């Protein structure tokens, strides 16, 4: 088996390959699948090394395909995310007890057995569970773990700078070719433009996304994650097993405060991102005034955006292309969770590729689009607000519902945040 690894000790553009148990060597631009005129041929190319891309690559490699994964970052790398995974994610990834034990020995893996939920500036409710319903992770560690586990050819530190069609193959960056391309580069995935006719540059993609925000459910978030020293640890009131969720007074978003061992993650996400910095500033001031966090934390907020499943205008397939995760706009509609949809869409994409038997035209990939809609919801055709209650009435009803323990446990947490009503992804589906 040929294995590529990517880490901080690997220079961008280099691939570390391993054959057998202990033979290591550095190569530049070498592929065991095919090498002609400086072009490396693979069975599939994945653009993006997050959970969606690495999961898809892992599944394809296990089925015997020769896969190349490229990412502009060198792993491990920081990633803006609240960072928790539910048991169905562990099941979908087929992580066995030994792998989990090895993971938690050297990485953050914080069991969650409770939540505190409230509307900002109002009294909260604590909901407890007898066993862990989720686990806090650091994307810095988790993504690097999944990428290493994929055991595919890696090109880290290499952004996708060009993409062109040659017959039935895609040629990436002029040197990497494959008949099937998986776009897993997140909300601003460069592959998405070839499916959805978007501008090529990152700045143009962001401008297009800003326009998108006025028509579709684009969520923007600001958040920070950092390690606490002993003094700061004693000043934070959040318990590691019980993240705190704070819903905005207009119910257009929510903030969170989540401690994972010695790490603290704080953030705020909203469906109306136009005044997000102001809302985030007010939220942090509220946390300090409430005594949840001290005022001297090193708070550098970082932003990201994503589309909610069932509202995304993006097409998820093209000729020889599949989009997965946030590139396809699959975040959970109420919580904004992206890791479970990323992992599951990565598995569904791998399954569609394997079932296509080398035929990757749109018709052959159509089952993947249908499966995404079945799993995560099809975009609504009618976006008219006719027949919906006025916002003031909806807000008043929401205030009252948030006071009910039954509603908080079974709707807000079990359904919206933990997805417990959704069955695990069936292997044969």
Question: Residues of each region from the PLM?
Answer:
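A conserved beta-strand/loop capping segment in the N-terminal third of enzymes
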Residues: 89-145
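FAD/FMN-dependent oxidoreductases across multiple families
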Residues: 159-162, 177, 274-353, 358-360
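C-terminal helical "tail/cap" subdomain of flavin- and related membrane-associated enzymes
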Residues: 351-429
